[in-house]
Amino acid sequence: MASLDRSSHTHQINLWIALTQFEPSFSATLGELGYKCDVIEDQFYITDAEGTQIIHPDVVLTSVDAEHSLVVDCKSSKLDQEQLTRYLTLNDHEEQLIVQNVIEGVSAGMLSTEVTLSSFDDLTNQDVPAEIAVVHFDHDPYSGLAIWNPDSQEFSHVPTAHLFPVNVEPGEPLPTGYYPFDIYEADKEAMVSSILNSIISLAMKHGEYSLEEVLDQAHPYWDKIGTGKQAELLERTERIHTELLEAGLDEYVEKIAGTGGKEWGQVSATLQAIQGRTDYYVDRALDRLPQSRLDSDAWQSSTDDEDNEGNMV
């Protein structure tokens, strides 16, 4: 597998969303069958005779026309058999995706679903239940990307199965714009860069911004991301924003009084000068961030103490 500039997990989410689009470099896409992204990194509950199961898919894609959903879990090379068993409880409770507002536009009694695992690694030699489909993102630096649905773990929905394999033109970079970053260590630089660029864009266009608006602009599918993941991303964004201020952004923006540090305003007309020096500010912020994983508690940040300091607009 070729080296990646983001986490495998983040790249896979981007690829699944890209498959719902009409990417010109893809030989075929799920978008041809009407698939669209319903949710990213969310959870829902299934109650049966064994109790209540919590399921955490990475992506749910649905074709309203086909009344069929793919419930996707993005994997590395390891599988949790207990987790797979929980996913299988979905087979007799598809309507819960509609009852819990995961999916819209399909009648509860008409929806069919398929649990799907994806990975840049080959999962066909692992003990994957026959009811679960597998998609292999075969990424090679020379031949490009091929997206396989192996015969042994083929989609039961025939039109979906017939779309594969999907080939991507050699030399095309993996898509990253649909889900530009997550809370993984490999995404740290992409996260800092995206946040800074969104701050500059919003401040120059509107004169002010909130951190929620920053994330909304940075993440095209922000409204599809589960509330728990949104909270984690916001927490990291608060910390990154603090470090960008320390790196020199505070010369251009100030807190807006009465917002608890949630909203900021542009105070310098020369903010556009940062555009030519984004690498400098990103590098300075990265140097100041915790020397720990992006998904660790060391990234927790509170604006409460900061609200009593600094300048107010």
Please give the residue ranges for each predicted region.
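Acidic-basic catalytic patches of nuclease active cores, encompassing PD-(D/E)XK
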Residues: M1-I54, S63-V64, E94-I98, D121-Q126, ...
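Conserved catalytic cores of phosphodiester-cleaving nucleases, focusing on short active-site segments
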Residues: F44-Q81, T85-T89
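N-terminal cationic-hydrophobic initiation segments that often serve targeting/anchoring roles
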Residues: L88-E95, L245
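Nucleic-acid nuclease catalytic cores
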Residues: D92-D140
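Short, well-ordered alpha-helical segments
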Residues: I13, Q81-T85, E235-E238
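Non-catalytic C-terminal interaction segments of nucleic acid-processing enzymes
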Residues: D121-V313
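Amphipathic alpha-helical segments that form well-ordered structural scaffolds
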Residues: A18, R86, R239-E243
